[in-house]
Amino acid sequence: MEKSTVYFTDFRCPVGTSQLDKLKKLCVAAGIRDIDMDGKFVAIKMHFGELGNLAFLRPNYAKAVADICKEQGGLPFLTDCNTLYPGSRKNALEHLDCANLNGFNTITTGCQIIIGDGLRGTDEIEVPVVNGEYCKTALIGHAIIDADIFISLSHFKGHEATGFGGALKNIGMGCGSRAGKMQQHASGKPAINEEVCRGCKRCAKECGSDAITYVNKKAVIDYDKCKGCGRCIGACSFDAVYNPNSSANEILDRKMAEYAQAVCHGRPHFHIVLVQDISPNCDCHGENDAPILPDIGMFASFDPVALDQACADACLKATPIENSQLGEHLSEPGWHCHHDHFKDSNPNVEWKATLDQAEKIGLGTREYELKKIK
């Protein structure tokens, strides 16, 4: 497969310009106007942020993309699917309220918001996964599959299970219905290290399945109830919750790539990633820790695999922020440095597996040419 082209622009803005101007210029340079959108429904997949989290992308960026689509005669809408876990996005009504409270509405974004898998997260379509090894079919939000054109607008950040979240995670995990998310997470279930557990009960508060109780002030997981979503792993500040299946995160990564294939295959698709506010964990948390790396810039491509690879490469070249989760880990006496910012921030991740699987099944290539736009 030939190299894909990834376009990049940094966040420097001379007086009289703005980041929104640069985003539009980036999208145009990357070829978004080559897509015939006239009279067609355009799904713009993004994350509206959990209430309390402030690292998610601002609605202004969504409006910039929606405006480009409308200029081309498209009928854009913002979309995401419901979550497995507790919080403010587990059904469509709460999800829409969350989006509004975080600034996403028809005025701020210039388009409608549709929750992709409906009221309860059950409005899904079973879609074949071309070349799928782990998933022969994927359960994708109905509204997302109904769209003629698919665009992803992603915030690049760290992630406690997948290493980082970029385009492929936004597409693969994000477009899965609640059952689809469960299918991806089913590779392994967490365990408790009782020697480290403080009995703080934070993991139980994050569990959407009521699977965690306490015996003698130590967490206990009911595996009949546990869905394997991994929220408890990210919730624990003491590393008491872990995944005993060393291959579980890798399988999750590979399933996620196959779900992304199901979403993109057979229709025009285009992808944008903003590498800023690079928090160590997912925007699904009701908080965001300090960034582990400095802001880098905006990337766009027709190839989500090359796009994520380019974003990851840029992050790996960046200097860690000292006062961050990554910086603290690197300064710990005896810390085993992986020379990999994502693994040094969250040691149990296997992020390269997502890119490897996505390339293997033909979604894109990890080989790319980077073109900088001023």
Q: What feature does the model see in each segment?
A:
Residues 2-53, 57-61, 71-80, 85-374:
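Extended, low-polarity segments enriched in aliphatic/aromatic residues
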